[in-house]
Regions:
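N-terminal, charged low-complexity regulatory/assembly segments
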Residues: 1-64
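Solvent-exposed, non-transmembrane amphipathic alpha-helical segments
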Residues: 28, 32, 80, 84, ...
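Amphipathic, alpha-helical segments enriched in basic
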Residues: 28-35, 39, 44, 49, ...
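Amphipathic interaction/junction segments at domain boundaries or subunit interfaces
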Residues: 52-58, 62-153, 157
Length: 199
């Protein structure tokens, strides 16, 4: 079973019970496989986003809703998957940054990795405001996470991805300031990414 589906349903089981959660997981897995078949033509650059994150989230959300779970709660179960995933990964990143003295280099690395992994080939469109000092600053003005979720009638789950970014980047190091103030998924006109090193 796909990881996001399995974990978000296990989180739901804490409240709704294992039997119902297992039924939802089975339905979500089936829907996920349908989404993969429907979108087999996704570009290689887009697939890491859609196949691993977006389609599983849509499938889980739809399955939660089909079982009568309110929209806000269904979004919360998906969001909680990303929160718990970040809680596992961030301490490792913090150790690496401290151990190798990488804090100063992180903004440039973040910019390089972001533009490569979230590039135009994957459906993202950028603007690059002027950077000041040691920072990564860019605006995403077109986001396939939002566009795909909207196409499937559930743009509200996009904020679960946005919140996952905040959990992942918001506490990497005391001198690294995560300064994003808005996202398309939360109703903004862009996602104004900012990761800044401050002495």
């Amino acid at each position: 079973m796909q990881k996001l589906i399995k974990t978000s349903c296990a989180i739901a089981a804490e409240e709704i019970g294992k039997e119902k959660a297992d039924r939802i997981a089975d339905a979500a897995q089936k829907r996920y496989e349908e989404l993969l078949a429907e979108n087999a033509g996704d570009s290689k650059a887009l697939q890491p986003h859609t196949f691993r994150r977006i389609y599983p989230a849509i499938a889980a959300y739809e399955a939660f809703r089909a079982e009568g779970i309110e929209s806000e709660k269904a979004v919360w179960y998906v969001r909680e998957y990303f929160q718990r995933d970040a809680a596992k990964k961030v301490p490792h990143l913090q150790r690496m940054i401290r151990m190798f003295g990488l804090a100063k280099k992180i903004p440039k690395l973040f910019m390089k990795i972001s533009v490569k992994s979230f590039g135009p080939e994957a459906g993202f469109k950028y603007e690059f405001p002027e950077s000041r000092g040691n920072e990564a600053r860019f605006n995403i003005v077109r986001c396939p996470y939002y566009e795909t979720c909207r196409r499937y009638g559930c743009p509200e789950i996009t904020r679960a991805f946005c919140d996952g970014d905040d959990a992942g980047y918001g506490n990497l190091h005391p001198k690294l300031i995560w300064g994003r103030t808005k996202t398309i998924g939360r109703g903004g006109d862009c996602c104004d990414f900012l990761l800044q090193y401050q002495n």
